[in-house]
Amino acid sequence: MQFSKMHGLGNDFMVVDAVTQNVYFSPELIRRLADRHTGVGFDQMLVVEPPYDPELDFHYRIFNADGSEVSQCGNGARCFARFVRLKGLTNKREISVSTQTGRMILSVTEDEQVCVNMGEPDFEPQTVPFRAAKAEKTYILRAAEHTVLCGVVSMGNPHCVMQVDDVSVANVALLGPVLENHERFPERANIGFMQVVSRDHIRLRVYERGAGETQACGSGACAAVAVGVVQDLLNENVHVELPGGSLHIRWQGPGHPLYMTGPATHVYDGFIHL
């Protein structure tokens, strides 16, 4: 099986063409391939499939390193767009894809940056999903003897975002896994630790569901800005600084789609016998 290794700001992926190759991945096989000592090593596996809808270009599947399938990965979406062009699966600069939960438009710029229409952030608890009687801008969660104030939003996957004074010393290793598996998130959640530098600039670390802390999380950056906008902490154009690099997020507020722009890097191509 042929594959490519790619990354979006250090969030790394094994990308597989299932349009021209016949492939099947069990959770056990994905876990083996994800192992950084004995496999390929990656945060997520991205699989390019033929479209289920003839009006779309591709179907986009995402698997975490633990073998679980998820419905959204923003950094992965940018790599997906670069991959299908690099491999000659399309020459379009505007690429339409379906995911587990909806549709996305991926736009490749002249300098090979990728702008992703991530859709409108959804704050309804039942959509996230999150156990709450009604939608609030802020919730109180208790975890590991800590009381946490956070915002909760779906970007096609569940996110919990808390504001911290200094992201460099945030206790991500402790609070990340505890909140990821909090009883109020029936499908677990991605946990964002956001430092507001100014109304146009945040620093962010994300503990990803099923992957742990990563160098960057595109949907996590989108979620942090969405929460920051509704809490009136941020303007509509925000520079998001992550450990692996920076993204630009634009959101005009409720009723509008959110846009994420950033790089996607091809590292190497490989072949593996399964």
Curated annotation (Swiss-Prot):
Q: Does the keyword Nucleotidyltransferase apply?
A: no
Task: State the function annotated in the UniProt record.
Answer: Catalyzes the stereoinversion of LL-2,6-diaminopimelate (L,L-DAP) to meso-diaminopimelate (meso-DAP), a precursor of L-lysine and an essential component of the bacterial peptidoglycan.
Q: Where in the cell is it found?
A: Cytoplasm
Which pathway does it operate in?
Amino-acid biosynthesis; L-lysine biosynthesis via DAP pathway; DL-2,6-diaminopimelate from LL-2,6-diaminopimelate: step 1/1
Per the annotation, which location comes first and is thus the protein's main one? cytoplasm
| Record Pfam families | DAP_epimerase
Family the UniProt entry places it in: Belongs to the diaminopimelate epimerase family.
Q: How does it assemble?
A: Homodimer.
Gene3D superfamilies xrefs: Diaminopimelate Epimerase, Chain A, domain 1
Q: Which gene encodes it?
A: dapF
| Superkingdom to which the source organism belongs | Bacteria
Question: What residues does the record give for site: Could be important to modulate the pK values of the two catalytic cysteine residues?
Answer: H159, E208
Q: Which InterPro entries match?
A: DAP_epimerase_AS, DAP_epimerase_DapF
Q: Which residues are catalytic?
A: C73, C217
Q: What is this protein called?
A: Diaminopimelate epimerase
Give a GO cellular-component term. cytosol
Q: Which organism is it from?
A: Yersinia pestis
Q: Which reaction does it catalyse?
A: (2S,6S)-2,6-diaminopimelate = meso-2,6-diaminopimelate
Q: EC number(s) of the enzyme?
A: 5.1.1.7
Residues bound to substrate are N11, Q44, N64, G74, N75, N157, N190, E208, R209, G218, S219
List the Gene Ontology MF annotations in alphabetical order.
diaminopimelate epimerase activity
The processes (GO biological process) annotated in the record are: lysine biosynthetic process via diaminopimelate
Keywords noted in UniProt: Amino-acid biosynthesis, Cytoplasm, Isomerase, Lysine biosynthesis
